[in-house]
Amino acid sequence: MSCNSPSGAHPPTTHQVIRKLALQEGAAALKALANAAGLEDQFERRAAIDAIGRHPHGRELRSIILRALRDPSEYVVRTACEVVAQWELQEAHELVVALLANPSKATRQTAIRTLGTIWVDADFPTVFRIYNDAWENEIRREAAWVLRQRAHSAHWRTLFDAFQVDELARHRQWACELAEKFSVPDILPVLSQLSSDVDGHVRKAAWRAIQTLSSR
């Protein structure tokens, strides 16, 4: 990689050159990005992965994104996850699932978020188990968010039962919203209890669900 600069000006850094490649059309730019993704410096590799994700034809280098999910640098891995999420790259599914067991909390959190964009129904038990068992609040909340976004009729009641007793008010609110969308009137007694919740948002969501279900 090279970049001409005016006489007396500081030459651009490698990071700057890599970032500019994301805006350049043509095979030469893609080849340069592919080479940059293999550089020794982890932050230069991360910059290359990010640039590939932003390049109009970056998907031609999707094999490099898949490889980056196994990179020894957590920074590179997380950036690759972000590209997978942006592209909704289903080919990366199993590699992202494997990252749910990564020692890094930040990487696990990013992997959960990414999995939500390439979700398959079989992911529900895995992410629900993380929601139940993780001791880090950030991980539990990320898992809960993905579960809420991906809820459907097959497992909404499992989520409702867990969310409606969660200490986080937002999750209790989600329980009410799930009931409103998927439930039948037999769940009204539980919603009645939630309508007296200490949190105003939960009470409002519970009353709305009660009104919706009562009209069915």
Show the residue positions of the predicted features.
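N-terminal alpha-helical scaffold/docking segments in eukaryotic complex subunits
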Residues: 1-55, 204-211
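Amphipathic alpha-helical scaffolding segments comprising HEAT/armadillo-like alpha-solenoid repeats
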Residues: 1-6, 24-38, 57-70, 89-101, ...
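Alpha-helix N-cap/helix-start positions at coil->helix boundaries
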Residues: 11-12, 27, 42-43, 74-75, ...
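Alpha-solenoid HEAT/ARM repeat scaffold
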Residues: 12-19, 31, 46-47, 63, ...
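Alpha-helical adaptor scaffolds
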Residues: 137-164, 169
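Long, ordered, amphipathic alpha-helical scaffolds
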Residues: 169, 174-181, 185-216
